Amino acid sequence: MKLAESMYAGPAHIGTLRVASSFRNVHAIMHAPLGDDYFNVMRSMLERERDFTPVTASIVDRHVLARGSQEKVVENIQRKDKEESPDLILLTPTCTSSILQEDLQNFVNRASETSTSDVLLADVNHYRVNELQAADRTLEQIVRFYIEKTRAKDPGSPDPGGAGRRQASSSTESGTEENLKGACGGEKTKKPSANILGMFTLGFHNQHDCRELKRLLAELDIEVNEVIPEGGLVSNLKNLPKAWFNIVPYREVGLMTAVYLEKEFGMPYTSTTPMGIIQTSAFIREMALMCHEVYNNSSTKCSQTDFESCLISNTKKVPKTYINKQTHFVSQAGWFARSIDCQNLTGQKTVVFGDATHAASMTKILVREMGIHVVCAGTYCKHDADWFREQVSGFCDQVLITDDHSQIGDIISQIEPAAIFGTQMERHIGK
């Protein structure tokens, strides 16, 4: 066991609840003892939203231990179904209540018989994954559930998944056209469009990043099809395959969903994080290539005139022209890199630590765009260690993969860097 103070990523049920509470009209029921039900207070304090956090704790007490949980869990699901009328009720245990080894899937099946809402059990191993891994898995599970539900309602529709699998073994033109059709036989959007996967509650600057992504896509004449899970409706998940491609801003959450959609519908995706001038340039080029791939291989209703009117239509000229304009006349990144504040750090030693996405991107920005010496770059995402090492290789002297705050504290005290780019924990260490 670890003290909550020393944890970079929380237990698995926190990730599941973050995804559930990000969707609109979704209610989560947490099967847990007293002490595990702090998510409501934490989210209300940090997000400061007007609405109540849609999470109910089904408390495991002495009566439950004596008689079993089924009656209480089913009763709570049915009560919330009548009171809230949510589109989806998500049941999740915690690592503590998992010790009871109860058949929660049976509870869900029983509650589903009398509930008008969909009822789903979060399929997460609470002893093997952390908060971020559980969030990634839960989002993919919810998307899979509603796409399969839509297919089951319309069994006569074409099977894009089958077409996608056929395309892997056969490059026939008809297979390609079937594969690139939208949800359950629907067509792609007329204009180039994208889904943004992985924006959710309590995320690090997720709202600001989403706003900037939407602005970037609008300037490139790319429509936003769906943003999930933050502010999304589960009833709209069937529309995900209508987009031309998927954007995964953060590897931690959304990557499994993008891989699933690629496998089932042949939808390309990019997991390049547009942080910094160089990575934003690569991000724009990837989007241009994906748009051309879909336009050339699919039966979209986008006319050649409409497509060529989009800024993204010229894969060679547009990214270079757009990026040069943004760098020299719009963005202040180049100005900041030459400012006194930044030049004071030029050649100085720094330490970077955080989640894999932000730590890797920040390391590259500091080295390539600001000329700052990164002595140590690290992440607490141990499950993504190989990718992180590959990304920061050649940009730092030392790579640290750990979720123990004392190790990064020791390294900071040894190096004595001029600046620390890290989490709240590193802020306390630096003081």
UniProtKB/Swiss-Prot annotation:
Its EC number is 1.3.7.7. Its cofactor is [4Fe-4S] cluster. Transmembrane segments: none annotated. It catalyses: chlorophyllide a + oxidized 2[4Fe-4S]-[ferredoxin] + 2 ADP + 2 phosphate = protochlorophyllide a + reduced 2[4Fe-4S]-[ferredoxin] + 2 ATP + 2 H2O. InterPro entries: ChlB/BchB/BchZ, Nase/OxRdtase_comp1, Protochl_reductB. One of its GO terms (cellular component) is chloroplast. It comes from the Eukaryota. It holds the Pfam family Oxidored_nitro. Gene3D superfamilies: 1.20.89.20, Nitrogenase molybdenum iron protein domain. Keywords: 4Fe-4S, ATP-binding, Chlorophyll biosynthesis, Chloroplast, Iron, Iron-sulfur, Metal-binding, Nucleotide-binding, Oxidoreductase, Photosynthesis, Plastid. The keyword 4Fe-4S applies. The keyword Oxidoreductase applies. Signal peptide: none annotated. One of its GO terms (biological process) is light-independent chlorophyll biosynthetic process. Binds 1 [4Fe-4S] cluster per heterodimer. The cluster is bound at the heterodimer interface by residues from both subunits. It is found in: Plastid, Chloroplast. GO terms for molecular function: 4 iron, 4 sulfur cluster binding; ATP binding; metal ion binding; oxidoreductase activity, acting on iron-sulfur proteins as donors. Component of the dark-operative protochlorophyllide reductase (DPOR) that uses Mg-ATP and reduced ferredoxin to reduce ring D of protochlorophyllide (Pchlide) to form chlorophyllide a (Chlide). This reaction is light-independent. The NB-protein (ChlN-ChlB) is the catalytic component of the complex. NCBIfam families: DPOR_BchB. Belongs to the ChlB/BchB/BchZ family. Protochlorophyllide reductase is composed of three subunits; ChlL, ChlN and ChlB. Forms a heterotetramer of two ChlB and two ChlN subunits. PANTHER family: LIGHT-INDEPENDENT PROTOCHLOROPHYLLIDE REDUCTASE SUBUNIT B. This is Light-independent protochlorophyllide reductase subunit B. It comes from Chlamydomonas applanata. The gene is chlB.
